[in-house]
Amino acid sequence: MSGLTHFDAAGHAHMVDVGGKQETQRIAIARGTIRMLPATFALIRDGKAKKGDVLGVARIAAIQGAKRTAELIPLCHPLALTRVAVDFELDDALPGVHCVAQVETFGRTGVEMEALTAVQVGLLTVYDMCKAVDRGMVITEVSVREKRGGKSGDWKAEDTAG
C-alpha cells in the first residue's frame, strides 16, 4: 500500500489532484449494523414506530448522505454519482438491522467515502427515529466490503463470500 495521499511533502493537507487520472466506472459497497433491544426491533419490523416508516426514511437519508459526502469530508472531491442503492436487512438474531449501500460513478476517483457515508447516515437515521424507546442502540461494523474500478483495480474484503 502506498503512502498517505492527502498530505504534501511538508505535511500539509491538500485535496489530491485527480485531473490526470483516467475516467472509469467506479463502484463501492459498504455495510454496517445497528444493534437494538428486541422491542425496538419489533417496532421497526412491524412498522409501528411513532415517527413512521423507519427504514423508508433511513433509505432516503442514506442516499442524501452519499450525495453530500464532499460537504462533510473536507478533502473529498464532489462527484456526479450515477447510482446509489441502499438496502436494509432485518436480523432477528442480533436483534438489529444491517445497511448495505452501493454507490457508482463514472469518474477519476473512487466512491468508497460516499458508500461509507450512506451507511452511516442511514444507521444514524434509524437511531434518531428510535432513540425515544432505545438510547442504547449501537452502530457497529461499518466498513467497505468491495470496490471496483480505477488504477488500483478491484478489491473485496477477505471475509466477503463470492
From Swiss-Prot:
EC number: 4.6.1.17
Residue stretches spanning the membrane: none
The protein's annotated pathway: Cofactor biosynthesis; molybdopterin biosynthesis
Keyword annotations: Lyase, Molybdenum cofactor biosynthesis
Coiled coil found in the keyword field: no
Binding site for substrate: 75-77, 113-114
Enzyme class: lyase
Keyword Lyase: yes
InterPro entries in the cross-refs: MoaC, MoaC_bact/euk, MoaC_sf, MoCo_biosynth_MoaA/MoaC, Mopterin_CF_biosynth-C_dom
Gene Ontology terms: biological process: Mo-molybdopterin cofactor biosynthetic process
Catalytic activity annotation: (8S)-3',8-cyclo-7,8-dihydroguanosine 5'-triphosphate = cyclic pyranopterin phosphate + diphosphate
Pfam families attached to this UniProt entry: MoaC
Gene3D superfamilies: Molybdopterin cofactor biosynthesis C (MoaC) domain
GO molecular function term, any single one: cyclic pyranopterin monophosphate synthase activity
Active-site residues (renumbered): 128
HAMAP family documented for this protein: MoaC_B (MF_01224_B)
Assembly notes: Homohexamer; trimer of dimers.
PANTHER family hit by this protein: CYCLIC PYRANOPTERIN MONOPHOSPHATE SYNTHASE, MOLYBDOPTERIN COFACTOR SYNTHESIS PROTEIN A
Function: Catalyzes the conversion of (8S)-3',8-cyclo-7,8-dihydroguanosine 5'-triphosphate to cyclic pyranopterin monophosphate (cPMP).
Family: Belongs to the MoaC family.
Name the UniProt record assigns to this protein: Cyclic pyranopterin monophosphate synthase
Originating species: Burkholderia ambifaria (strain MC40-6)
Gene name tied to this protein: moaC
